[in-house]
Amino acid sequence: MIIYLHGFDSNSPGNHEKVLQLQFIDPDVRLISYSTRHPKHDMQHLLKEVDKMLQLNVDERPLICGVGLGGYWAERIGFLCDIRQVIFNPNLFPYENMEGKIDRPEEYADIATKCVTNFREKNRDRCLVILSRNDEALNSQRTSEELHHYYEIVWDEEQTHKFKNISPHLQRIKAFKTLG
């Protein structure tokens, strides 16, 4: 089972395309939708939905994937639910760059302070990070500097922030899932 979390643009047709691409790894791909506008509510909702899916799951190696803001959530929810994560161009600093787009961006900073201390150290090697060198929305170099101590970083030379085509990375993702 692969759980997919969309980014800020929840209505993007690219979400459906990524789900179809992920089905080459596992036919059981589940999209969880969330508001993107209310961080604390989103965290509760995502934890509850992922937990529900894991209770009914028969896959011994489930995976959670997310793009952009979905990557922010996939890393945290995956850690809390003890499943491996794959994150594409994760938005690690939504409290800095989502001002005016969501109701309470400061809640992201609050969530960060309430998260498990040194959670990335405890999550070491359980997350695969795929970054675009052509990310027009986020500073991928800053993201790499933040995460490379804990996780493998894979660089993509072609895609932009929304990562429309993940197919060149499917074999790597499949191998990572199999390690689960």
Swiss-Prot record:
One of its GO terms (cellular component) is cytosol. Coiled coil: none annotated. Transmembrane segments: none annotated. It holds the Pfam family UPF0227. One of its GO terms (molecular function) is hydrolase activity, acting on ester bonds. Signal peptide: none annotated. InterPro entries: AB_hydrolase_fold, UPF0227, UPF0227/Esterase_YqiA. Gene3D superfamilies: alpha/beta hydrolase. Belongs to the UPF0227 family. This is UPF0227 protein YcfP. It comes from Escherichia coli (strain K12). The lineage of its organism: Bacteria, Pseudomonadati, Pseudomonadota, Gammaproteobacteria, Enterobacterales. The gene is ycfP.
